[in-house]
Amino acid sequence: MHVQDRHGRPVMSLRLSITGRCNVNCIYCHRDGMTSSRGELSAADIEKLCRVASDLGVGKIRLSGGEPLIRDDIVEIVERINNIGFRDISITTNGTLLEGYSAALSEAGLDRVNVSFDTLNPETYRFITRKDYLERVKSGITSAVDVGLDPVKINMVILRGVNHHEVWDMFEFCREKGAVLQIIELLKTESCHDDAVERYHCDITPIEAELAEMADRIRTRKFMQDRKKYYIDGGEIEVVRPMDNTRFCANCTRLRVTPDGKLKPCLLRNDNLVDTRDALRENDTGRLRELFFEAIRRRSPYYTP
């Protein structure tokens, strides 16, 4: 049984940002390749939070960052979470370290992976990330598919004047690899600064109209913010459109955790966080449950009709 917030939305998944560190420096992210691990939750503390979440009916865990594979204990973290008994464990990664970890992560209990990968063009990749890791990422995607992580999804943020013309090339790449393409509208968040949104935000309505015209079948995923999935010639494309999207909020089922242990009721807000660090230090499970309920109580749609 899922706990519901005061708007009737069930809390079904927990997304833990387990590090703010990253080994790339993307043009739309203001974290600037952060390198400090200060304040990050330990693997044991991550397990404590996940156990409380499981007791409250959460069935899905996603690990993200920063770049989660930077953590030396990432396999241990997945093992600890898997031992709790969640039905789905996933990771969002930039893919640069994935080839070396995919087999161990799969064995530890990881079910699936999302790879942030915005372009197949080496020069464009270097422009976006300020690194030359494109071939590493492609090898990581191949490795993830080969070890049986399923699905492997490619997160492609559409950037005006940068990669907006590459959607079909990326679709062909994904179809060939057996991966699912997710095209994502650039969203203003704590990690994406205003200048980047103003400079690179691209209205993806024309792309979605083209997908609708070409699709053999279209599916609407209610508990994934009513996002559309388009099936085209044996391939799949999902469209993620959070900007000013009331359905994105109305069907949100996710609670988030920051790298330093704050429960985050809303992706787009930082003024209503719930700090769990004292309860974690004191190993106070009862207090952690209370804090989860408080975070759920604070959940409110950011975009409203």
From Swiss-Prot:
Its cofactor is [4Fe-4S] cluster. The keyword Oxidoreductase does not apply. Keywords: 4Fe-4S, GTP-binding, Iron, Iron-sulfur, Lyase, Metal-binding, Molybdenum cofactor biosynthesis, Nucleotide-binding, S-adenosyl-L-methionine. Binds 2 [4Fe-4S] clusters. Binds 1 [4Fe-4S] cluster coordinated with 3 cysteines and an exchangeable S-adenosyl-L-methionine and 1 [4Fe-4S] cluster coordinated with 3 cysteines and the GTP-derived substrate. It catalyses: GTP + AH2 + S-adenosyl-L-methionine = (8S)-3',8-cyclo-7,8-dihydroguanosine 5'-triphosphate + 5'-deoxyadenosine + L-methionine + A + H(+). Its EC number is 4.1.99.22. S-adenosyl-L-methionine binds at residues 28, 66, 116. GTP binds at residues 15, 62, 92, 153, 254-256. SMART domains: Elp3. PANTHER family: MOLYBDENUM COFACTOR BIOSYNTHESIS PROTEIN 1 (PTHR22960:SF0), MOLYBDOPTERIN COFACTOR SYNTHESIS PROTEIN A (PTHR22960). Catalyzes the cyclization of GTP to (8S)-3',8-cyclo-7,8-dihydroguanosine 5'-triphosphate. This is Probable GTP 3',8-cyclase. It comes from Methanothermobacter thermautotrophicus (strain ATCC 29096 / DSM 1053 / JCM 10044 / NBRC 100330 / Delta H).
